[in-house]
From Swiss-Prot:
Annotated HAMAP family: Ribosomal_uL3_B (MF_01325_B)
Superkingdom, taxonomy of origin: Bacteria
Positions of transmembrane segments: none
Similarity comment text for this entry: Belongs to the universal ribosomal protein uL3 family.
GO CC term, one of those recorded: cytosolic large ribosomal subunit
Keywords of the record: Ribonucleoprotein, Ribosomal protein, RNA-binding, rRNA-binding
Subunit annotation: Part of the 50S ribosomal subunit. Forms a cluster with proteins L14 and L19.
InterPro entries the record matches: Ribosomal_uL3, Ribosomal_uL3_bac/org-type, Ribosomal_uL3_CS, Transl_B-barrel_sf
Organism: Thermosynechococcus vestitus (strain NIES-2133 / IAM M-273 / BP-1)
One MF term in the entry's GO annotations: structural constituent of ribosome
Function noted in UniProt: One of the primary rRNA binding proteins, it binds directly near the 3'-end of the 23S rRNA, where it nucleates assembly of the 50S subunit.
Protein name: Large ribosomal subunit protein uL3
GO BP annotation list: translation
Length: 212
């Protein structure tokens, strides 16, 4: 895994490429993320760096959290994330990770939390087909059969049913970076990202899985 950055989703807009075509993009306010801890095989059993993001008031953190951040002389920050690396010799405590680690045209993976929809039914949550809407039908939005009868005499785990929808971790892979603005700590990514405006997102270089 390679080092990434944390940011806040600001919202969506559009830009125009060299051919004049409209490109939908999401604007992310990313970093700077100071390094708060460097983990090594001798002390932790693996190699990684921990970064912080999102300044808060000191009273919003517990005493152990403040003590942990003070070791790297980092101001009070809300979020901590780890990025596993093969070699951490190029990093040191307090070093800031900024958006200039990315470049236009690069592919990235973005991880965030999807918008919570609350308790949702079968059609909205799983795209079930509805029943007849006329001719005396009483099955409009019912699920249909949930299993067999006496044998097995139960509903198998994993059966798609109504329940809470959204508010889960979502990773969208291989999105293209359109522009990077180091002065304003902005990164423009093609397409939609998970979560509402103001949501926390993690951006890492794309991990190639299977065919490109």
């Amino acid at each position: 895994m390679t080092v990434g950055i944390l940011g806040t989703k600001l919202g969506m807009t559009q830009i125009f490429d060299e051919a004049g075509r409209s490109v939908p993009i999401t604007v992310v306010q990313a970093g700077p993320c100071p390094i708060t801890q460097i983990k090594t095989p001798q002390t932790d059993g693996y190699t990684a760096i921990q970064v912080a993001y999102g300044e808060v008031r000191e009273k919003n953190l517990s005493r152990p959290e403040r003590g942990h951040l003070n070791k790297s002389q980092t101001p009070p920050m809300r979020h901590l994330r780890e990025f596993r690396l093969e070699d951490v010799s190029a990093y040191q405590l307090g070093q800031a990770i900024t958006v200039d680690i990315f470049s236009p045209g690069q592919l990235v993976d973005v991880r965030g939390t999807s918008i919570g929809r609350g308790f949702a039914g079968y059609q909205k949550r799983h795209n079930f087909k509805r029943g007849p809407m006329a001719h005396g039908s009483k099955n409009h939005r019912l699920p249909g059969s949930t299993g067999a009868g006496t044998t097995p005499g139960r509903v198998f785990p994993g059966k798609r049913m109504a329940g809470r929808m959204g508010n889960t971790a979502v990773t969208i892979r291989k999105l293209q970076v359109m522009r990077v603005d180091p002065e304003r700590n902005l990164i423009l990514i093609k397409g939609a990202l998970p979560g509402k405006p103001g949501a926390l997102v993690s951006i890492t270089p794309a991990k190639v899985v299977g065919r490109k």
